Amino acid sequence: KIKMATLVSPGILVKERDLTNMVIGESSSDGAIAITAEKGPVEEVVTVSNEVELVEAFGKPNASTFEWFFTAASFLKYAATLRVVRINSGHVNAGVSGTPILVKNSEHWLANFSDGSANVGQWAARTPGTWGNNLKVWQCPSLTVYEQKLAANNRVNGALAEGVTAVVLDNVDENNYAVVVDDIISFTSDAAGATPLAGHEGVEYIVTAVNTGTNTLTVKQHNVFSTKGLAAVVANESYITRRWRWYEQFENAPGTSTSVSNKSGSGDEMHILITDEDGGISGVANTILEKFEGVSKASDAKTESGDNNNYIDVIYNQSSYVYW
């Protein structure tokens, strides 16, 4: 028998204890909370398991939402999951019609807006809140919009000096041959657009303004972080090739899908691109957020693998930012 030592004066007694039979398990507690948030579905339960998922679903905290956010975040520090519902606090979805609308969540969109009968504009932000004001949806519905040789229908009207930013055309809004803001143009010496003007090889210009009264475009060099004007002189009656703003982001111009071609149709494809116009989402203005290549305007169009390729359905199933 082993006797324990007895201390007759102040001192330290060391004892060993085997704790290997104790297992501390992870928390299995679940919680629920209703919050206000800058983004995210309204009146829909979203289950999150950490703060990263909370931010992805409902955005970062701000002056109006921080109390709710940090209450939820604090619970997640010791809980397994948290069910979060965003309160309907008067926000509406950003859209193109100018008429305020509220699309609470996907189920609400399917029941009230998916067939287009609500007639409230072509696009709406995926969830309510001012965050959607940053979004811009770009569409390229045809080969002509993607790229067009203006030929003799709309040429440069008057010689231009190197460095200038004002380009006068015969008619900037010529029917079927117009040039609009954000178009990309280049100058050639031939109507077919095959031969660039001397000094303009590999140089394109983005249109930043259009004056229909004077038929004048304001341009700057494309993909150059400055306001540089023309790289060289431009002769009177030079030819122009016009392209869609984001043409270089897609492999080819939209055409006809195999699905529609097999049914004797044509011209159903379109490209869609979504940008962070103001930089409020990504931190950098005009950042590309999403792009959808060769989606179809035909309601029954299919991809080569048999999936639905109608652009409304593709946007609904794949976009994180908008509804049609």
Predicted regions and their residues:
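N-terminal-proximal low-complexity accessory segments that begin disordered
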Residues: 2-97, 103-107, 117-131, 137-139
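E2/UBC-UEV (E2-variant) core
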Residues: 284-324
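Surface-exposed interaction regions enriched in Ser/Thr/Asp/Glu
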Residues: 227-247, 263-265, 271, 278
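Short, surface-exposed beta-strand/loop "edge" segments at domain boundaries and coil↔beta transitions
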Residues: 39-44, 54-55, 91-95, 128-135, ...
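Autoprocessing Asn-cyclization modules and mimics
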Residues: 109-124, 130-235
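Short amphipathic, basic-aromatic surface patches that mediate peripheral association
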Residues: 171-174, 246-262
